[in-house]
Design a protein with these regions (language model features):
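Charged interaction scaffolds used for protein-protein
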Residues: 1-10, 18-43, 51-96
């Protein structure tokens, strides 16, 4: 999932070091601690979008609640799938 549409606006979304740093600062937790906690997952998604927008010079300007209100369950599920698929993708790339 490389972008997300919130309130009709396509925004970049990717995991970056900045996203992990934002998440740690906002929650006091590491990304590995997300587990099945929906609030932590939404917060990490927010951090990924905020960080990608910052890196790409795209205006973001939403707080966490506004962002969450504009998300769908499908957005969250798609992002959760990319989180669980990421280690397998890395493994297959290094094995090839």
């Amino acid at each position: 999932m490389k972008e997300i549409t919130i309130y009709g606006k396509k925004l970049p979304m990717r995991m970056t070091m900045g996203a992990m740093l934002r998440f740690k600062r906002m929650t006091g937790k590491d990304v590995e601690e997300i587990g099945h906690d929906v609030a932590l997952l939404v917060t990490f998604m927010y951090c990924c979008v905020a960080s990608a927008c910052n890196a790409d010079n795209v205006e973001f300007g939403m707080d966490l609640d506004k962002f969450a209100d504009g998300m769908s369950v499908e957005d969250m599920n798609g992002f959760a799938e990319t989180l669980t698929a990421a280690p397998d993708e890395k493994k297959s790339r290094t094995e090839a």
